[in-house]
Curated annotation (Swiss-Prot):
UniProt domain Toprim: residue ranges: 80-175
Presence of keyword Nuclease: no
Name of the protein: Recombination protein RecR
Gene3D superfamilies registered for this protein in UniProt: 3.30.60.80, 3.40.1360.10, 6.10.250.240, RecR Domain 1
Record-stated family: Belongs to the RecR family.
SMART domains: TOPRIM
GO molecular function: DNA binding; zinc ion binding
Pfam assignment, any one: Toprim_4
Disulfide linkage: none
């Protein structure tokens, strides 16, 4: 069905979001049209504010409104461990369990040979620089249990072990193919406690 151009453009915009197909995008577009002008303005303002006011921490790569982020500036955290994750949402998931007290490093992606993504395409160089200049003695790789997550973990292990840095991986309480973001807190806690060396 053909929609008026403004609705069609809104549907197209919603369709660009991950996990949103045309049907859901259409529902969201029509819901948005039915919202009050005040709610639509607030929604638009919040979108723009998030885009303008957020940045990536210059140390760990986490999404933040202050640079460096509040985690990197917290001197009470364990300086000996850095937990490496794919995305900022994974930092939030790990922080919820309140059991990991070290620092983080966000890769902003995974090595994916099938998709043409190599080590230079993700935030790895700054991790190496950080490790060579800092006090960390262990890197915990917390990438998802997928082929790309495993490839990334093995690459990190291969480049860091010769430098004498202990590289561990979250234990397998996480199902293969699962996302850390959706794991419950007990599963994440067990995965950290029972991590294995790579």
């Amino acid at each position: 069905m053909l929609y008026p151009i403004p609705i069609a453009k809104l549907i197209e915009s919603y369709s660009k979001l991950p996990g949103i197909g045309v049907k859901t995008a259409t529902r969201l577009a029509f819901y948005t049209i039915g919202m009050s002008d005040e709610d639509v303005n607030d929604f638009a303002k919040n979108l723009l504010a998030a885009k303008r006011e957020l940045t990536y921490c210059s140390i760990c790569g986490n999404l933040t409104d202050d640079d460096p982020c509040h985690i990197c500036t917290d001197s009470s955290r364990d300086k000996e461990t850095i937990l490496v994750v794919e995305a900022s949402k994974d930092v939030s998931a790990m922080e919820k369990i309140q059991e990991y007290h070290g620092y983080y490093h966000v890769l902003h992606g995974l090595i994916s040979p099938m998709n043409g993504v190599g080590p230079d395409d993700i935030n790895l160089k700054s991790l190496i620089t950080r490790l060579m200049a800092g006090e960390a003695t262990e890197v915990i790789v917390a990438t998802n249990a997928t082929a790309d997550g495993e490839a990334t973990a093995m690459y990190i292990s291969r480049i860091l072990k010769p430098a004498g840095i202990k590289v561990t991986r979250l234990a397998r309480g996480l199902a293969v193919g699962s996302d850390i973001e959706y794991a419950d807190e007990v599963t994440l806690l067990r995965a950290i406690e029972n991590r294995t060396e790579l």
